[in-house]
């Protein structure tokens, strides 16, 4: 296993949840945090600890987004009208790397970020290599013609681990999809419970 893969799995162990619902998660072997003190019994978490865990889960799920960038999503969610928790989820689900993952063009959010970084993705016919690019309703996202035969793409599209959510319309034969509508929290197929309301509470302290 590569160091990169190990670091991804450490996120699962540190948080004590199988964030992406994958069969290879280390939690299938041991359900304690990494490190020599990982098996110590934990006391009852404080409200702050619960809020922090909710934030770390959401950050980790989307490829361990940096704290600076994640806080910007929170601030933008607060500025927008409507429910702040729903706004936060919408912004995260509009990230181009998240869309690539949801459309099953990559097996993990980490692979999706790398895929976008390397210029394999087109949005409305133009190459976009910024993982945090926000996709809009009606945008067409597709894999570049030269990249359609990459093993990682073929493995992802043929994987039975996940289904494409209803807010995305995807043709895997053409490796192209459309962002049909902005999702609500209840629409997003998280393998574990996400609590954006606790994330909002964390930043509102």
UniProtKB/Swiss-Prot annotation:
InterPro entries: Ribosomal_uS4, Ribosomal_uS4_bac-type, Ribosomal_uS4_CS, Ribosomal_uS4_N, S4_RNA-bd, S4_RNA-bd_sf. SMART domains: Ribosomal_S4, S4. Residues 27-46 are annotated as: Disordered. One of its GO terms (biological process) is ribosomal small subunit biogenesis. It holds the Pfam family S4. This is Small ribosomal subunit protein uS4. Part of the 30S ribosomal subunit. Contacts protein S5. The interaction surface between S4 and S5 is involved in control of translational fidelity. Gene3D superfamilies: Ribosomal Protein S4 Delta 41, Chain A, domain 1 (1.10.1050.10), RNA-binding S4 domain (3.10.290.10).
């Amino acid at each position: 296993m590569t160091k990169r893969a190990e670091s991804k799995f450490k996120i699962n162990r540190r948080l004590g949840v199988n964030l992406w619902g994958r069969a290879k998660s280390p939690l299938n072997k041991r359900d304690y945090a990494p490190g020599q003190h990982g098996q110590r019994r934990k006391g009852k978490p404080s409200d702050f600890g619960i809020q922090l865990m909710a934030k770390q889960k959401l950050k980790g799920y989307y490829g361990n987004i940096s704290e600076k960038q994640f806080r910007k999503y929170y601030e933008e969610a607060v500025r927008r009208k409507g429910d702040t928790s729903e706004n936060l989820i919408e912004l995260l689900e509009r990230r181009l790397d998240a869309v690539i993952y949801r459309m099953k063009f990559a097996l993990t959010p980490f692979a999706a970020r790398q895929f976008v970084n390397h210029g394999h993705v087109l949005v409305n016919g133009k190459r976009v290599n910024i993982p945090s690019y926000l996709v809009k309703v009606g945008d067409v996202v597709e894999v570049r013609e030269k990249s359609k035969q990459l093993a990682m793409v073929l493995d992802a599209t043929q994987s039975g681990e996940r289904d494409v959510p209803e807010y995305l319309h995807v043709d895997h034969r053409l490796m192209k999809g459309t962002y049909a509508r902005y999702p609500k929290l209840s629409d997003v197929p998280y393998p574990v419970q996400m609590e954006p309301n606790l994330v909002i509470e964390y930043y509102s302290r």
